[in-house]
Amino acid sequence: MKHTLIASFVLAMCLAAGSAQADKLRIISWADYVPADLIAAFKKETGIDVELTLSNNEEMISKLRATGGAGYDLAQPSQDRILAAQREFGIYKAIDLTKLKLEQFQPEFLSIVRKNTTLDGKVYGLPYLWGTDGLVVNSKITKVADYPDLCRPDLKGKTAVRLRRPTLMAFAFAAGKDPFALYGDPKAYGALMDQVGATLIACKANFKFFYDNKDQLLNGIRSGEVVAAMMWDTGGWTLNRSNPDIQFIVPRSGALGWLDTFALPARGRNDAAAYAWINFTMRPENAARVIKSVGSFSAAMNTAPLIDPRLKAQFAASFPNNDLKSIHWYPAIPPGLEEMEGRVLDRVKAAN
């Protein structure tokens, strides 16, 4: 009888633990991507609690690599960071597309992400949010049309960029090169990065600072210390709301486009909740909540009528006629390129 009671107790504890796991979804994502009101609505509809960990691309890869893909049920890396990490570390599992309402996704974004996250015929990412990097300028003080304008003599000490790979890509495109087309040629890519590094070193006196976070740049532009900078679209539109002279513009050489995704960690323990969350968040009314929270645009269908008219007007001013053809979308990064870029960025940082 005693053994029976012990066995029954152990079984009950196991069932309780399993139930607890089934009632929790562990997400690792970016700030503002998973707003509290969306979590509450999901809990009300499904009974599933959401445990959120804030992170970024580098941390997501590091955490999932350290655990072999355990600890989370859903991750939200950028599309260009998935394949290299999967090839090298195996930190994700393939997505079962039959469990998703694919009609809720805008076809063009679904196509881009599937192309850049498919390995051996299996899909590892789905689109969530997108945005661009371009130029922000105080048009009352100066005019700029492309990234090299940040290096003009009259703007010495008055511009800013982030010392990260997007800046390398931006200046490469501005030089008339396509860095993405050279991903398969490490020698040519390295030569291009060296060229861009030399350009940034020659321009270094123009940079008031290399910004590390959004507040540093936003405050620098608000104060007038910085009059033009490489910046993300929503930051520019935020500044524009308080000062119409500050505008986000698409550079002559094109904007850089990013797409953040849904991805399933390899050892996630609640795929059912992850699929439920994806289907839930891609409904137009729920995608609109996310847009309101983060200020970026969703890959969900039918959100346009639900977006703040002011945000739509700002987008239209930056992208006339909804022209997205000038956007250079980040493709998957092959292994080894980021180390090459890192050495170039280190040289720029160390240069006098």
Which stretches of residues belong to each language-model region?
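Mature extracytoplasmic/periplasmic domains
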Residues: L256, P265-K325
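A bilobed periplasmic-binding-protein/Venus flytrap-type ligand-binding module shared by bacterial periplasmic
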Residues: G134-I141, A174, L259-N270, R289-V290
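Early extracytoplasmic/lumenal segment of secretory-pathway proteins
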Residues: D23-A85
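Periplasmic-binding protein-like
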Residues: M193-C203, S242-A266
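A ligand-binding cleft/hinge motif common to bilobed small-molecule-binding domains
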Residues: R81-A84, A228-D245
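Conserved C-terminal helix/tail region of periplasmic/extracytoplasmic solute-binding proteins
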Residues: N321-N352
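Extracytoplasmic ligand-binding site segments that recognize negatively charged/polar headgroups
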Residues: Q76-L218
